[in-house]
């Protein structure tokens, strides 16, 4: 892991290069995804079967997981896992319940009623990865806010494995309240949810993480359906002063690096001695990590430690990065919170490590990446509702403002708009 002692602009340039390196999207992948989406749109289940055999190496007659399979899954998971899952569910619900909003009704004294109706989406699709790692936590994080919002039907898709679907995923889906589960993955699963097939229902919105093919497929179908976000590789920035614990920081950096080779792990510190200790700790901890090959590749390609003169400058640099995860290993981290402008999720102090947010604390772990924390937010209950405005005017209320409407409509050259007002008062030209 490279230690960089440079000025702000040079450090920022280097970080941008790291991010560009982590987000290289080959044109061949985009073309392949576009072809998959088009084929599923046209050939539907036939295309799903073809791509499942091609990419997953299995032939599946019925892609829907039966109720019996879901019930049996609980026999294959540990009681400790179920206990942890239930604790996570409790915390996720208690946090997201506070995000729920009410419809608005505004009645004035002049015969005017205005308002906003908030309604849940009818149905959504949740993508759950099934590649190099299995993510039951993602099931809870994507499904529970939707349930709290009142979504009527939740469909889950996840890639098949040789022995079926990981029972931990099925147990999480059952606990969260998923209505239907399908053994289908990749870009073809996203296309199926967007357009519908003989087996898989069309949904209104698709959420959930995935690999590059899944991310590009979501981009491809956006507009046909809504999506949560186009997630890039995982990323973490740790800001540390001389009080930072090198073991903790190294462990937290590696917690993101182990996701995949394109993940980004950056430490920004005011203390060069700490930087050296973190570098050594990363090497030491890599020796015993089961996913060390992935983590090492990530650290070598997209990892760095930046030395800056002050915490103020560290915060400026972090705001320019707008990371998915930001940890503050500094004195009085709560005081620095006001100066964090752009970050998906912020972890304050040495005992609020990123995995706490990933699994148990309650805030959502579906977060904006690749600098999009400047304008995107974590997944929330709001992502599963839509809003309609409504208004009612009495004749007198409309009469009071009609001249303003006519003036504005005529100024824009939209004379039928003006006439629609005038005709109600016998003033049409």
UniProtKB/Swiss-Prot annotation:
Q: Which organism is it from?
A: Bacillus anthracis
Q: Which family does it belong to?
A: Belongs to the histidinol dehydrogenase family.
Pathway per the UniProt entry: Amino-acid biosynthesis; L-histidine biosynthesis; L-histidine from 5-phospho-alpha-D-ribose 1-diphosphate: step 9/9
Q: Record-annotated residues binding NAD(+)? A: 127, 188, 211
**What InterPro entries does the entry give?**
Ald_DH/histidinol_DH, Histidinol_DH_CS, Histidinol_DH_monofunct, Hstdl_DH
- The reaction(s) this protein catalyses: L-histidinol + 2 NAD(+) + H2O = L-histidine + 2 NADH + 3 H(+)
Q: Which residues form the active site?
A: 324-325
The record's function comment reads: Catalyzes the sequential NAD-dependent oxidations of L-histidinol to L-histidinaldehyde and then to L-histidine.
Extract the PROSITE patterns matched here.
HISOL_DEHYDROGENASE
Instruction: Give the cofactor binding note.
Output: Binds 1 zinc ion per subunit.
Record key words, sorted: Amino-acid biosynthesis, Histidine biosynthesis, Metal-binding, NAD, Oxidoreductase, Zinc
Has keyword Manganese?
no
Q: Which cofactors are required for activity?
A: Zn(2+)
Lineage runs: Bacteria, Bacillati, Bacillota, Bacilli, Bacillales
Known HAMAP family for this protein?
A: HisD
Any one Gene Ontology BP term: L-histidine biosynthetic process
Binding annotation for substrate = 234, 256, 259, 325, 358, 412, 417
Q: Which GO terms describe its cellular component?
A: cytosol
According to its UniProt record, the EC number is 1.1.1.23
The UniProt entry's coiled-coil ranges are none
Q: State one Pfam family annotation.
A: Histidinol_dh
Q: Where does Zn(2+) bind?
A: 256, 259, 358, 417
What would be an example GO MF term here?
A: histidinol dehydrogenase activity
User: What is the protein named?
Assistant: Histidinol dehydrogenase
């Amino acid at each position: 892991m490279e230690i960089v002692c440079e000025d702000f602009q040079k450090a920022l340039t280097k970080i941008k290069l790291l991010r560009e390196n982590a987000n290289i999207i080959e044109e061949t992948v985009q073309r392949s995804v576009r072809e998959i989406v088009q084929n599923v749109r046209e050939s539907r289940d036939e295309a799903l079967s073809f791509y499942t055999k091609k990419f997953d190496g299995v032939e599946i007659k019925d892609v829907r997981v039966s109720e019996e399979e879901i019930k049996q899954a609980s026999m294959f998971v540990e009681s400790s896992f179920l206990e942890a899952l239930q604790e996570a569910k409790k915390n996720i619900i208690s946090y997201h319940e506070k995000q729920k909003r009410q419809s608005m009704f505004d009645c004035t004294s002049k015969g005017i009623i205005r308002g906003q109706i908030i309604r849940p989406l009818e149905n959504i699709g949740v993508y759950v990865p099934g590649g190099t790692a299995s993510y039951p936590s993602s099931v809870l994080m994507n499904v529970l806010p939707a349930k709290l919002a009142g979504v009527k039907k939740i469909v889950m898709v996840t890639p098949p494995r040789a022995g079926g679907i990981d029972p931990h995923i099925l147990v999480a889906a059952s606990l969260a309240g998923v209505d239907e589960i399908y053994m289908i993955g990749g870009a073809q699963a996203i296309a199926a949810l967007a357009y519908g097939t003989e087996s898989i229902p069309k949904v209104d919105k698709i959420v959930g993480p995935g690999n590059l093919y899944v991310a590009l497929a979501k981009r491809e179908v956006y507009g046909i359906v809504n999506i949560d976000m186009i997630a890039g590789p995982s990323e973490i920035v740790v800001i540390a002063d001389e009080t930072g614990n090198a073991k903790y920081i190294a462990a937290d950096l590696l917690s993101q690096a182990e996701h995949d080779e394109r993940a980004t792990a950056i430490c920004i510190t005011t203390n060069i001695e700490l930087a050296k200790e973190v570098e050594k700790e990363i090497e030491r901890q890599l020796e015993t990590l089961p996913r060390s090959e992935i983590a090492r590749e990530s650290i070598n390609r997209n990892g760095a430690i930046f030395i800056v003169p002050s915490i103020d400058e560290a915060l400026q640099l972090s705001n320019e990065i707008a990371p998915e995860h930001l940890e503050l290993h500094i004195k009085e981290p709560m005081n620095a919170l006001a100066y964090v402008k752009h970050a998906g999720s912020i972890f304050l102090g040495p005992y609020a490590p990123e995995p706490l947010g990933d699994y148990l604390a309650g805030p959502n772990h579906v977060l904006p990446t690749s600098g999009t924390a400047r304008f995107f937010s974590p997944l929330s209950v709001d992502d599963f509702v839509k809003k309609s405005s409504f208004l009612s005017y009495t004749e007198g209320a409309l009469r009071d403002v009609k001249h303003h409407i006519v003036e504005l409509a005529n100024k824009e050259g939209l004379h039928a708009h003006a006439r629609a007002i005038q005709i109600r008062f016998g003033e049409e030209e």
